[in-house]
Amino acid sequence: MKVNTNIISLKTQEYLRKNNEGMTQAQERLASGKRINSSLDDAAGLAVVTRMNVKSTGLDAASKNSSMGIDLLQTADSALSSMSSILQRMRQLAVQSSNGSFSDEDRKQYTAEFGSLIKELDHVADTTNYNNIKLLDQTATGAATQVSIQASDKANDLINIDLFNAKGLSAGTITLGSGSTVAGYSALSVADADSSQQATEAIDELINNISNGRALLGAGMSRLSYNVSNVNNQSIATKASASSIEDADMAAEMSEMTKYKILTQTSISMLSQANQTPQMLTQLINS
């Protein structure tokens, strides 16, 4: 037995340090709910989790982008629906006005309402916007003809959706079923029977054009909706993978904390006894 160096005490102190460290780590994991709280816990795991968190954050942003794109297209579609309803009323007026039994005085009433509806068509086309992006008017210089939606967390992964130029139907030309062309809806009239007949045919083409435009918007909304589901599923899977690496097993950590707590208490008791060994040797020598 040696007196100058208390080997048992030194070993017990080291065990006490390790047991206290294990108990502290278990307590930290229980408090945070995470198995990895620093690179010391698992450097490789932390690197993987960081990459996964970056990816899931990007996917969540892409989901919001697509949802905003759907909102934008729904705004445009709603406006086109209003324009279609207006055109249907205009067609009704044109059909009524084409009746030869009406006098010019009778047609003045139709003309007044018909003209106000033309102005409302322009108003809808001019003012429909989403976040200051004009959705139905491509006549201005620099006007947007399509919107680009960032579809995923990868750079330049874009979904391009063409916008419908409803304003172009106002001053442009309309090709009728007969192959002839007439001016846009702003030039239509129900002032007499002939112009009313022509307006009826032109409005049919306008309604058909708007229906085609709505179909394109609907296709865009459908694609964006599927993209939302896709990126959401990817995000959920990525978060689940990160969780399996990063999150703590609470039951296991509680068991670890209890184990190290008992070992720490035992180490303290053993250290107290180990520190008394030199005194016991001295008493033995003196006796």
Swiss-Prot record:
Keywords: Bacterial flagellum, Secreted
GO CC terms in record: bacterial-type flagellum; extracellular region
Main location: secreted
General function of this protein: Flagellin is the subunit protein which polymerizes to form the filaments of bacterial flagella.
PANTHER family (UniProt xref): FLAGELLIN (PTHR42792:SF2)
Family to which the UniProt record says this protein belongs: Belongs to the bacterial flagellin family.
Name of the protein: Flagellin
Lineage, highest ranks first: Bacteria, Bacillati, Bacillota, Bacilli, Bacillales
Gene from which this protein is expressed: flaA
